[in-house]
A protein has these predicted regions:
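Gly/Ser-rich "nucleophile elbow"/oxyanion-hole loop immediately N-terminal to the catalytic nucleophile
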Residues: 5-14, 84-106, 123-128
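Gly/Ala-rich beta-loop-alpha elbow adjacent to hydrolase catalytic centers
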Residues: 105-109, 113
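Alpha/beta-hydrolase active-site loop
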Residues: 69-92
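Accessory cap/linker subdomain of secreted extracellular hydrolases
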Residues: 136-168
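A conserved short beta-strand
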Residues: 126-138
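Short beta-to-alpha linker loops that shape the active-site pocket of alpha/beta-hydrolase fold enzymes
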Residues: 24, 51, 56-60
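Short, surface-exposed "cap/lid" segments of acyl-processing enzymes
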Residues: 4-49
């Protein structure tokens, strides 16, 4: 499942498409497709005239099971599927896209952005061309820096994070 944010004002021409990857969330109900979850960055991009998609990652939203936290293949697939759905929705509503595709994400979304960018450029070049990508503050080194940080501070401020990491 995913969330689509249409531009917030009438367009004078074709629109760029941006895929916003959300940060780490511990609850299925906080996934972008769920009512009231809202993604501020999706709204910001839409207010500037972008068509916006925000993917739920597998295990979040309405999908069964646990989230495969920082599992690059499943994260990338979620983004590709959301992009396809967004393009299809635009086409069926007479919204023309201009061919520009932007990817961005923060926290887990940074990791997802890197995974999606790699997949788009290696497996989907006939379908998508990434214009620019901004993966921000992602957990890129789970086996090193992230684990070291979790274990070195006895007062780790996010105790909910460790079970997500172990379950993944």
């Amino acid at each position: 499942s995913s969330h689509f944010e249409p531009p917030q004002y009438p367009s004078n021409g074709p629109l760029p498409l941006v895929s916003v990857q959300h940060g780490t969330t511990a609850r299925k109900s906080d996934a972008p497709s769920q009512p009231g979850s809202g993604d501020i960055w999706a709204s910001v991009f839409a207010s500037y005239g972008y068509a916006v998609v925000v993917a739920d990652y597998l295990g979040l939203g309405s999908s069964p099971g646990y989230q495969a936290y920082c599992h690059a293949p499943s994260e990338a697939t979620s983004v590709v599927d959301a992009l396809r759905a967004g393009k299809s929705l635009c086409a069926s509503n007479n919204v023309t896209l201009n061919g520009q595709l932007f990817l961005t994400g923060y926290s887990q979304g940074g990791h997802v952005t890197m995974a999606a960018h790699r997949e788009l450029e290696t497996l989907h070049t006939n379908e998508f061309t990434v214009t620019a990508s901004a993966p921000c503050a992602g957990p890129y080194d789970l086996g090193g820096v992230t684990i070291q940080s979790l274990l070195s501070d006895p007062a780790y401020p996010n105790p909910w994070y460790f079970p997500i990491l172990l379950a993944a």
